[in-house]
């Protein structure tokens, strides 16, 4: 090796050493922590005109060892009635995304067929901040290392409390809000467990020393999977009542045989499998199979509808066909700050999560409710009348058997039960209320498994009553909501002057007024043209008569005194009527301009070939194998 080569080699060796040292030092430097600003969503594809609801979204790591990350989507309240409130919403499954709640139920926007966003009349963000969370890990936009799924409720709870602590570190100004948890279906297991953990956390000296207690004020659970025993045994009575199965038929005998197998499991003293019992799950499957005719079957989430067999409700609600492609567009995932580590596109429910979450060592959440109520925590349970999978009869039977605060069920005193009070909303019979000792039950008539999807305004009225919103000091037009004939606290559901929906209605009124003015101006123009035509006709008629009387005189047009200029009068009039670019009225009221969408609209795609925004294929585990089979077997209680 020559001198120059040796020197070059030595120089490279020194440089390599320095590079190694620099990289090592860089690894020792702390990674810059994210701030709230990193999660700010400044725009969304397809957003409606006007200001966007203030929102933040993204991932928070809750388990570095397994790369476990929760996805959240937070919407700030539109107005504060008397004090700040935050509602955490969870969907069920297990393994179903809370974007269902955000975009089909209580959130401020819903996705249209052309993937635009429309404001929801009755959304829950009017007087409360909304926090939607995809959990357990692997649900929706949340993700985790393969095989590291959650299987028990205690583990789920621990991860969720970790998430809340980290979320409040990012957004400390919300930590002292009145805090509520709401959700539906299998969230009936999640929510009581999380509530118990929060109350226990608040008692810790370390938490109290830092003044970091969370102001948990209440729980709302819709069509909840809370007491599996009561729910399993309610399926056939509900099917009889609704005419799904006829008594004394071969179909009823087949269902009763399945119930007998379930009862053997329920009567065995066993500390495992009390939340998910395969033999008992078969009851619902058998009922649904008995409705199979042709290629259709009953929709287990809304018995008024049917679905393709063997989905039997899995394709419902209809908005789902709009949401999945919308949440897979690249510009949407970028707007929501979806990490690149999330390899697969959004799916509503994860078969892998549901298949692992059996909770075989967990006790049903119904066993937690009495103590929560006795500690003074208000709880509201509500049910849609036309839901089969988590039907209202199971919830009502559970309440009737539950003991707390010295009474059973809705007892006011021994043998005296709280009455069911009829509820009317805006003149319609909406359902009934029943209340006693911190527990409220609401039945919604003609509603499905997802009550807010059917009745956003009614559920908002229910919410405002429960959390204590009273618009008396705010002003506005109160909603006509009566329980037992009495109005109670005044709620607005978008009727107060500063509400978002009121502003939207005012905008529609202004647009309608503009169109009326346009049509009115058109009518006036038509009258003017008609009068001009009559005058024209009179002049023509008189000119012809004059020519007939004086054949020696040449016809010189309408204006005989103007000479040759008369020949240009009609063309100029015609040109005025046929104007385009110079027509101020036409420019102001061009229908195509009024119907024009914002330029950021996401266009629907007719085929995979024209979908450049897709960010990944569906998770195979969600569509086939055990996970898919469990969805067909109706495990998912979203």
Swiss-Prot record:
Protease with a carboxypeptidase B-like function involved in the C-terminal processing of the lysine and arginine residues from protein precursors. Promotes cell fusion and is involved in the programmed cell death. The keyword Transmembrane applies. The gene is KEX1. Residues 542-638 are cytoplasmic. The chain crosses the membrane at residues 521-541. Keywords: Apoptosis, Carboxypeptidase, Glycoprotein, Golgi apparatus, Hydrolase, Membrane, Protease, Signal, Transmembrane, Transmembrane helix. GO terms for biological process: apoptotic process; proteolysis. This is Pheromone-processing carboxypeptidase KEX1. It is an enzyme of class 3 (hydrolase).
